[in-house]
UniProtKB/Swiss-Prot annotation:
Single GO MF annotation: argininosuccinate lyase activity
InterPro entries given in the database record: Arg_succ_lyase_C, Argininosuccinate_lyase, Fumarase/histidase_N, Fumarate_lyase_CS, Fumarate_lyase_fam, Fumarate_lyase_N, L-Aspartase-like
Lineage per the UniProt record: Bacteria, Bacillati, Bacillota, Clostridia, Eubacteriales
Domain of life of the organism encoding this protein: Bacteria
Primary localisation category: cytoplasm
Enzyme class: lyase
Protein name: Argininosuccinate lyase
Gene Ontology biological process terms from the UniProt entry: arginine biosynthetic process via ornithine; L-arginine biosynthetic process
Gene Ontology cellular-component annotations: cytosol
Catalytic activity: 2-(N(omega)-L-arginino)succinate = fumarate + L-arginine
Length: 465
């Protein structure tokens, strides 16, 4: 059933029908389409735009269709143009002429953005739960590794000693920001567009606030042209999804490196690894690699919609039909990525000894040696130069700084005393960094407490429970 056609002398070409159809994509919004139609039909009856009898017939029919679709008694007809025409034609088939009244005071232009907002609000709720679960995994892993020394890197060169807990909590901060962006996207999705019509509202005395309340929106949109033209909320969501994938990808890249024989910092659980068809010894970090690869796919979804929208005049244009495929693909990809990544991190084993050995072999305590001299009265720039000379000699002699005798150290500066060895002990290097945000156990425990409170604040929230 087409929702148009009176002014045409002949039907559309079958190829055009296939090209124009969106039913393969938007059929996943059947619940939202029916929910929106239920609220609309109820409002039409309350406003006496249609009779109470007609309103009741329509809502009863819609509820029956929803029940049958949920139970797979009714399946979507893929020859329909879109989910809106399918629901309306199915309704008319079941209840007769009353079904033709459903579209009174409504256009597909405001109907489709209503469906999409209803769908996206639910999806954002689920997405935030998935991120919060990953945060819980990072929280528990961080508690286990407050004292696990590892090298921190800059330019992928060993820099200063930190702890695995400190490292994991860095990603927890990223995902906290991601949750903030999801919350923001939800707020801007939470405005009800129905009643905007094709572009200029309606001549009927509709009650948009009633529909908004019935559907759980906090407000209504205020300009009908903008309402049917707006896909900012989709683009904002895609941007947030892209950042989530960027964070997962960065973390995945590190996991991939840590799994190598050269690093051997972690071992992934068999359940989150794969093998080789030819090399029996292989254990591959495919989950992390796939997440890294799928990041480009989500970026592509964002660029797709930005490109679609960049040249569109007001109001609705058919180009906008491309929004849902990009959004649904990104949502599906990010959701699966978050869940598999959380499982991978939760089950991975940490090689604490290898992490500490790696930190010890990279002169990661050189800054602390310079700081030792400064605290004894040297200027930092002078101390920096002295320690640089010490490191150079250690490299030549294949030694670590702590292998040098006090006499050897005094050749570079008479300031060195016996207490220097405690100052450059890796645990001391970490524990002395008590500044908020640092790797000391005191600082990390504070970060853990903050993360716990961040997670706890969502208890009882619709987007958590």
């Amino acid at each position: 059933m087409k929702l148009w056609g009176g002014r045409f002398k002949k039907g559309t070409d079958e190829l055009v029908n296939d090209f124009n159809s969106s039913i393969n994509i938007d059929s996943r919004m059947y619940k939202e389409d029916i929910e929106g139609s239920l609220a609309h039909a109820t409002m039409l009856g309350e406003q006496n735009i249609i009779s109470k009898e007609a309103s009741l017939k329509i809502t009863s029919g819609l509820l029956e269709i929803l029940k049958r679709m949920d139970n797979n008694v009714i399946n979507v007809d893929l020859t329909s143009e879109d989910i809106h025409s399918f629901v309306e034609s199915t309704l008319t088939y079941y209840i007769g002429e009353y079904g033709k009244m459903l579209h009174t005071a409504r256009s597909r232009n405001d109907q489709v953005t209503l469906d999409l907002k209803l769908y996206l609000k639910k999806a954002l709720v689920k997405l935030r739960k998935d991120i919060l679960y990953l945060e819980k995994v990072l929280l528990e892993k961080s508690k286990e590794h407050i004292s696990t020394i590892m090298p921190g890197y800059t330019h992928m060169q060993k820099a200063q000693p930190i702890t695995l807990s400190h490292h994991l909590l860095a990603y927890a901060e990223m995902f906290k920001r991601d949750i903030g962006r999801i919350n923001d996207a939800y707020k801007r999705t939470d405005s009800m567009p129905l009643g905007s019509g094709a572009l200029a509202t309606s001549t009927y005395p509709i009650d948009r606030y009633m529909v908004a309340k019935d559907l759980g929106f906090s407000t209504i949109t205020l300009n009908s042209l903008d309402s049917v033209s707006d896909r900012d909320y989709v683009i904002e969501t895609l941007s947030a999804l892209s950042l989530i994938m960027m964070h997962l990808s960065r973390f995945s890249e590190e996991i991939i490196l840590w799994c190598t024989g050269e690093f051997n910092f972690v071992e992934l659980d068999d359940g989150y690894s794969t093998g080789s068809s030819i090399m029996p010894q292989k254990k591959n970090p495919d989950v992390a690699e796939l997440i890294r690869g799928k990041t480009g796919r989500v970026y592509g979804d964002l660029i797709t919609l930005l490109t679609v929208m960049k040249g569109i005049p007001l109001a609705y244009n058919k180009d906008m039909q491309e929004d849902k495929e990009a959004l649904f693909d990104a949502l599906d990809t990010v959701t699966l990525s978050l869940k598999t990544f959380a499982g991978m991190i939760k089950t991975m084993k940490v090689n604490k000894d290898n992490m500490k050995k790696s930190a010890a072999l990279g002169f990661t305590n050189a800054t602390d040696l310079a700081d030792y001299l400064v605290k004894k009265g040297s200027y930092f720039r002078d101390a920096h130069g002295i320690v640089g000379q010490i490191v150079l000699q250690c490299i030549k002699d294949n030694k670590m700084i702590e292998d040098l005798t006090l006499a050897e150290l005094k050749e570079y500066s008479p300031t060195f005393e016996e207490d220097v060895y405690e100052a450059i002990n890796l645990y001391t290097c970490v524990e002395e960094r008590k500044v908020i945000g640092g790797p000391s156990s005191e600082s990390v425990k504070f970060q853990i407490k903050e993360l716990q409170e961040f997670i706890h604040q969502f208890k009882g929230d619709e987007m958590y429970d």
